[in-house]
């Protein structure tokens, strides 16, 4: 009593406290970063190693395996995957959430150092690592085009100057430069000319390497001067290499230009990049795992004027893709939804109270509670994102509830003629415990979420804390500011036997009278209501089992990503043509704004594309509808497939799969994996629940197998090393020397001129100089035949792995797809030597599914414990919790009606309903217990009177929560796919709960009261008179 009086009778202090909360909130709002979702990126480090010319199997066994054994000893590694292709190996390490990325990077470097002695010689550089996830979509793509500069020169400028400058920006984690490679001097050998001159390829390589050296020459000095010695020991351009003498034939000098074409070119000619049909160099920028995407993009954009000022006029620098506009638009939509929710809630209050002054009180309480929450969000290190702003939107209906309960009870005393200050004090005292019970039990719902681990726990933590803080501030405001404003702003009215009612008031009176009549009938037919109650419990179980489920709603971020997978024997020239064809098909779609893509490198038959769609306001279709439309056109392209998927704000795992979801096959036997993977992939491709089924197992690449006749080689004086060196020199794009320039280092690359290596006959032109100096053709001691060979070898842990990726057809949920895959694996009878499991997002979905029911039960148990403590009763909490089944039925039916799968967002809605709908029962039970204690009423009379007396605040609080969530259901535009499931769940649950709990709660109350009396009689002892 004294606590409430302290704030009611000291209005200045109360107002200043509320103002302080508001000012702190405004300051916190201005300092909060902006993001699409809470920070849920796993710490990921990518290790790269190269050995030019080595086959995928050689890279896997000699490079990947030693590194994996060393890296696998690092603490906190969630998953380790590797992919080895022609000349390169990439290992992805995904760490636990609580692992510091910088500490992990130090451990990775130590592991690389430990494995160094086990790696093969001839590697051009030590393995390197980068703190970035290559499977993440770039946050920004910059393109460089030029009419006069070559692609190699553009690539050099981009990688040497632009990438270095951008990498220094806070938040930038990794920059992939694609579309070409660094400049190089390329030596294209003529095998016939070499044979005629008797010059071996090793001799050419050694002559070039010896002619281009960089060694210190020292200095000369006398008593006065010092001279640094400098020589022309370096050759830097193709023109300087052409006259180089590599051999003497009968006294005549054989120069490099006589036996080879020497050109200024690039290190790897098998690379191509394009933007909107123009050749381009792409800078694909990814953020650090812990970085904020908006702040990072803003930092890059702020640097762009400086970057444009430093580039030559012949280069055009453009932004081809930027993730931030759709993120900002989505957050703006949420902010508008929040404003609409606040307005609707205030309108509900006004319609019920029909007083401007009375409406002003919750109109002040709501913004103070919401704005004050921003201060706590800042202190907790949160961000303004879709989930935290959705929490505030939902909180609108919650925070007004406390104010409504207090305000309505005070208004009831004022209508009875009590003086304002007395009414404020008395009304607050009566409902103070009720308000505290409602708020604490609501906060209790979120305690299990705060203890939840993994990605779902990280994702929901900000939502739970934000909502809990808003409820806590609302509780303080409703017990301090609200009664103070009621006492000083509202006026008492003369009691009337039949007060005048207009509009909504008349409707409310009619509803209350009708409710009273129907409630009397219900209390006389309790068994029927009990059957209905048990029916809702059973229906909950059935609906939860039957409803389609997914991990997270499919987002439309306005960006698509596509992976190209062509025939495994395709040439680079043909692959570049496929890239152009696919880009034309996509560019012609009316919903597409920009297309960039690249191909080449170690995997000639693959490529990547990034598509920026027009803003949502300029297109009618969703991203998924656009993909469905393009899929039909793209399927007509022979010899290659392009798999499109919408870029999501959440992507789990480090695999660069060509679809959104993955199923990984593991085996200790590579042969067993290669036997069963095609069978499993074929079976999964036939499932209607899956689309775009593809695999990263590529073991049908064209290979030319050379079989050495070792006896003949020994007789001819040739060793295997010389033969292998011949092949590497001829066909491996061998980097044989380094050219040092002020800004970078470039390579001299040697191979047979492409004019002489167009077919298998090129092998017939190869020869080796034996120990006697004679030229021995390769065909003398080797035979060759075509065969199939893998284009890549993949590992997970230390096991051979193959990942089957898939998308979902429109109208199919992830649960339906996973069930179909598990069923198919069982039907196929896959042996125990091949193990299958979901990975990436599908794996997290499986883990979340296993914990959903536990989470809901834990939330209900927590609420029960809190209510039991508050009421000092085992029974009354059960009465209050009896409101939950009807809410669950309403939520699940609403999701079915809107064809929305049960996702993590819908789970949040269910958790919220646990907190919302019990408020009705709390208000009923509190007044019924008070009526029994102080009024001497029977349980039936008490609960009947409580239901009628609390009918108006129950309607007000329910409608406030309903109208607070309604804008989420009706919202469109960017990010609506996240907001709508939450709104649908809450609105559906509230409507069904309101219809049923007004009748089931009093029946359950009476049932438990009779049960209590029955047990009390059994346990009572007879009184013995003395």
Swiss-Prot record:
Gene Ontology molecular function: any one: xenobiotic transmembrane transporter activity
Keywords attached to this entry: Cell inner membrane, Cell membrane, Membrane, Transmembrane, Transmembrane helix, Transport
One GO location term (cellular component): plasma membrane
Family from the record: Belongs to the resistance-nodulation-cell division (RND) (TC 2.A.6) family. MdtC subfamily.
Topology term for the membrane: Multi-pass membrane protein
Gene that this polypeptide is encoded by: mdtC
Species annotation: Salmonella gallinarum (strain 287/91 / NCTC 13346)
TM annotation in the entry: 15-35, 333-353, 360-380, 387-407, 431-451, 463-483, 528-548, 853-873, 897-917, 953-973, 984-1004
Subunit structure: Part of a tripartite efflux system composed of MdtA, MdtB and MdtC. MdtC forms a heteromultimer with MdtB.
UniProt-listed Pfam families: ACR_tran
Annotated protein name in UniProt: Multidrug resistance protein MdtC
Disulfide cross-links: none
Domain of life where this protein originates: Bacteria
HAMAP family per the UniProt record, alphabetical: MdtC
Subcellular location: Cell inner membrane
């Amino acid at each position: 009593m004294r606590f409430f009086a302290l704030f009611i009778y000291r209005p200045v202090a109360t107002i200043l406290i509320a103002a302080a909360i508001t000012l702190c909130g405004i300051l916190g709002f201005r300092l909060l970063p902006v993001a699409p979702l809470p920070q849920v990126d796993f710490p990921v480090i990518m290790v790269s190693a190269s050995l030019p010319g080595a086959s995928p199997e050689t890279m896997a066994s000699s490079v990947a395996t030693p590194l994996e054994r060393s890296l696998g000893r690092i603490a906190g590694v969630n998953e380790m995957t590797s992919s080895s292709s022609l000349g390169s190996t990439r290992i992805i390490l995904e760490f636990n959430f609580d692992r510091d990325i910088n500490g992990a990077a130090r451990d990775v470097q130590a592991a690389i150092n430990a494995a160094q002695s086990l790696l093969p010689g001839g590697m051009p550089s030590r393995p390197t690592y980068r703190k970035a996830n290559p499977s993440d979509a770039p946050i920004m793509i910059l393109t460089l085009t030029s009419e006069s500069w070559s692609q190699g020169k553009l690539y050099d400028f981009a990688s040497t100057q632009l990438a270095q400058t951008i990498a220094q920006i806070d938040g930038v984690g990794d920059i992939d430069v694609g579309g070409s490679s660094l400049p190089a001097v390329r030596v294209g050998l003529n095998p016939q000319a070499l044979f005629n001159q008797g010059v071996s390829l090793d001799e050419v390589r050694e002559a070039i390497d010896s002619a281009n050296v960089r060694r210190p020459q020292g200095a000369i000095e006398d008593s006065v001067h010092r001279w640094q010695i400098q020589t022309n020991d370096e050759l830097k351009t193709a023109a300087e290499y052409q006259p180089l003498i590599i051999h003497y034939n009968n006294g005549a000098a054989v120069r490099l230009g006589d036996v080879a074409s020497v050109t200024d070119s690039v290190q790897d000619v098998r690379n191509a990049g394009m933007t909107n049909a123009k050749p381009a160099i792409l800078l694909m920028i990814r953020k650090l795992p812990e970085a904020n995407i908006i702040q990072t993009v803003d930092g890059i954009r702020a640097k762009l004027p400086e970057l444009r000022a430093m580039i030559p006029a012949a280069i055009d620098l453009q932004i081809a893709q930027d993730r931030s506009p759709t993120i900002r638009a989505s957050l703006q939509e949420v902010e508008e939804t929040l404003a609409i929710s606040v307005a609707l809630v205030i309108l509900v209050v006004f319609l019920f109270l029909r007083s401007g002054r009375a409406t002003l009180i919750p109109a002040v309480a709501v913004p103070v509670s919401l704005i004050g929450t921003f201060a706590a969000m800042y202190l907790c290190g949160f961000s303004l994102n879709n989930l935290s702003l959705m929490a505030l939107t939902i909180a609108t209906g919650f925070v007004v509830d406390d104010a409504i309960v207090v305000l309505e009870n005070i208004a009831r005393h004022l209508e009875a003629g009590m003086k304002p200050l007395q009414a404020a004090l008395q009304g607050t005292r009566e409902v103070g415990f009720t308000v505290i019970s409602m708020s604490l039990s609501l906060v209790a719902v979120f305690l299990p979420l705060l203890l939840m681990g993994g990605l779902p726990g990280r994702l929901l933590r900000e939502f739970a804390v934000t909502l809990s803080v808003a409820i806590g501030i609302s509780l303080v405001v409703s017990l301090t500011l609200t009664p103070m404003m009621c006492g000083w702003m509202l006026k008492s009215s003369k009691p009337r036997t039949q007060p005048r009612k207009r509009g909504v008031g008349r409707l409310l009176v009619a509803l209350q009278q009708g409710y009273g009549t129907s409630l009397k009938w219900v209390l006389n037919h309790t068994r029927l209501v009990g059957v209905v109650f048990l029916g809702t419990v059973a229906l909950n179980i059935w609906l939860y089992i039957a409803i389609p489920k997914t991990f997270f709603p499919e987002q439309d971020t306005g960006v698509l990503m596509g992976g190209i997978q062509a025939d495994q024997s395709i040439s680079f020239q043909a692959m570049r043509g496929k890239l152009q064809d696919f880009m034309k098909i996509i560019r012609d779609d009316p919903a597409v704004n920009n297309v960039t893509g690249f191909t080449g490198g170690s995997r000639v038959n693959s490529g990547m594309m990034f598509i920026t769609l027009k803003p949502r306001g300029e297109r009618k279709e969703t991203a998924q509808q656009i993909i469905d439309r393009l899929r039909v056109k793209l399927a007509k392209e022979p010899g290659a497939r392009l798999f499109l998927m919408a870029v999501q704000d959440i992507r789990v795992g480090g695999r660069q799969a060509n679809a959104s979801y993955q199923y990984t096959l593991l085996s200790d036997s590579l042969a067993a994996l290669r036997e069963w993977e095609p069978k499993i992939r074929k079976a999964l491709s036939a499932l209607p629940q899956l689309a775009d089924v593809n695999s990263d197992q590529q073991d049908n690449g064209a290979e030319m197998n050379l079989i050495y006749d070792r006896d003949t080689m020994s007789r001819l004086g040739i060793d295997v090393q010389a033969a292998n060196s011949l092949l590497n020199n001829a066909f491996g794009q061998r980097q044989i020397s380094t050219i040092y320039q002020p800004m970078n280092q470039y390579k001299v690359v040697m191979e047979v001129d492409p004019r002489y290596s167009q077919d298998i006959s090129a092998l017939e032109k190869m020869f080796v100089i034996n120990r006697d100096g004679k030229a021995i053709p390769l065909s003398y001691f080797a035979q060759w035949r075509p065969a199939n060979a893998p284009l890549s070898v993949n590992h997970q842990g230390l096991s051979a792995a193959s990942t089957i990726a898939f998308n979902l057809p429109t109208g199919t949920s992830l649960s339906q797809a996973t069930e179909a895959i598990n069923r198919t694996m069982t039907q196929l009878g896959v042996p125990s030597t091949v193990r299958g499991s979901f990975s990436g997002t599908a794996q997290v979905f499986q883990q979340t599914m296993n914990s959903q029911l536990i989470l809901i039960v834990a939330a209900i148990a927590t609420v029960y414990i809190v209510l039991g403590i508050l009421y000092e009763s085992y029974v009354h909490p059960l009465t209050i919790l009896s409101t939950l089944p009807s809410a669950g039925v309403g939520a699940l039916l609403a999701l079915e009606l809107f064809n929305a799968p049960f996702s993590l967002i819908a789970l949040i809605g269910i958790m919220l309903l646990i907190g919302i709908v019990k408020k009705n029962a709390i208000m009923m039970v509190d007044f019924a217990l008070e009526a029994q204690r102080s009024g001497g009423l029977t349980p039936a009379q008490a609960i009947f009177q409580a239901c009628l007396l609390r009918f108006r605040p129950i309607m007000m609080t329910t409608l406030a929560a309903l109208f607070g969530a309604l804008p989420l259901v009706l919202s469109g535009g960017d990010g609506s796919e996240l907001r709508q499931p939450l709104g649908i769940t809450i609105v559906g649950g509230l409507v069904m709960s309101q219809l049923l709990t007004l009748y089931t709660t009093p029946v359950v109350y009476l049932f438990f009261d009779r049960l209590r009396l029955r047990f009390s009689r059994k346990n009572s002892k007879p009184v013995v008179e003395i």
